[in-house]
Structure formats: C-alpha cells, structure tokens
Amino acid sequence: MKVGVLALQGAFREHQKVLAACGAESVQVRKPEQLEDISALVIPGGESTTIGKLLLEFNLFEPLVKLGQGGLPVFGTCAGMILLAREIAGSGQPRLGLMDISVERNAFGRQVESFEADLDIPVLGEEPFRAVFIRAPYIIEAGGGVEVLARFGEKIVMARQGRCLAAAFHPELTGDLRIHRYFLEKCVRAGQNCKG
C-alpha cells in the first residue's frame, strides 16, 4: 500500500512521518502521473484557495475528482477538509466535492490564529485526542451519509463519509498516530463497504 500526500503546500512532510510511523509507505504528489500507483491520498492543510488554484494549474483537479468518485480513500486536514466539501460558505472557490458537507472557513475567527483542545473521538477510544487548530474551519452541515466523529463544543470538527475522512485540525502535528491509523485501517484497508 502506498499513500500519496499532496505536496503543494502545508505540512506534507509531517503527514509522511506519521504515515511512516504507522507502517505505511508514502509518496509526495505534485503531478497527475504520481496519482497512478497510490492506494489513498492525504490532503494537508495550507490555504485552501491557493491549493485549489494549484490543483487546477498542475492538472490535478479533475484526476482527483475522478479518483475520489471512483472510491480512492482521501483524508483531508484543515484546508484539505475544505477542499473535500460539497459547499464552502460564502465562497465559489474550487473544491473537490467528495463529501456531503458544508464548511465555514476560518470559523473560529481570524484573530484566533491557533489553539489546542482535547477532543473526545469515540472511534479512537476513551483517551482524548489533543487537537491543534490553526485558523481552522468547521463543518456547518453534514448530509445523511456523513458520520460525525468529533465536535468542539457544538461545532463538527471531524467526519467520515465512506472512504473519505475530514478533520478541521492538524493531527500530523501532535505525535498521536491514532487518526492516521484509523484512516489506514477503516478507510483504506477495510475497503469500500466499511461502515466503521
């Protein structure tokens, strides 16, 4: 199994380190041909508008939509979650639309640059997950096929739909491998019919 990590912006190297610690091989993706041999894709954080433009510029946008619609497991963190969304509040920016979610960008206020919080994520066990939020989005609406995995207060900050996983925070910056392991075990290895 080889996991592609979109390497246009953001903490892609950190994602690769976590994947390696989970025993998964990874490859940086910057060109369409690099999508050919991957079993899954991680879309890191960064600036979602910029990443969307770069996906178009590097001819990655359409191949990613087709692969995602065809069942490629995709894990998006922060800006990656925004790109996975069907709808982005107040924005017509490019998005992959692979999850039936609507998101709000910079949802915790632009003045709140970053913060950390303990999240209860039952699918990961009883121990809270220390999440790092950096100008984070959140999910304002989730369709019927979307499983909400975590909230911060009332705000949805982690969700799964089929083989797609989205987190508003940055698990790659924590040293906690559980979310990446969950993605590999439940979305990648378990196959399309996995329900959790």
Swiss-Prot record:
Active site per UniProt: 78, 170, 172
Key word Lyase present: yes
PROSITE patterns, per database record: PDXT_SNO_1 (PS01236), PDXT_SNO_2 (PS51130)
GO molecular function: glutaminase activity; pyridoxal 5'-phosphate synthase (glutamine hydrolysing) activity
UniProt entry keywords in alphabetical sequence: Glutamine amidotransferase, Hydrolase, Lyase, Pyridoxal phosphate
EC number: 4.3.3.6, 3.5.1.2
InterPro entries (UniProt xref): Class_I_gatase-like, PdxT/SNO, PdxT/SNO_CS
Record note on quaternary structure: In the presence of PdxS, forms a dodecamer of heterodimers. Only shows activity in the heterodimer.
Function, as annotated: Catalyzes the hydrolysis of glutamine to glutamate and ammonia as part of the biosynthesis of pyridoxal 5'-phosphate. The resulting ammonia molecule is channeled to the active site of PdxS.
The protein, known as: Pyridoxal 5'-phosphate synthase subunit PdxT
Species of provenance: Pelotomaculum thermopropionicum (strain DSM 13744 / JCM 10971 / SI)
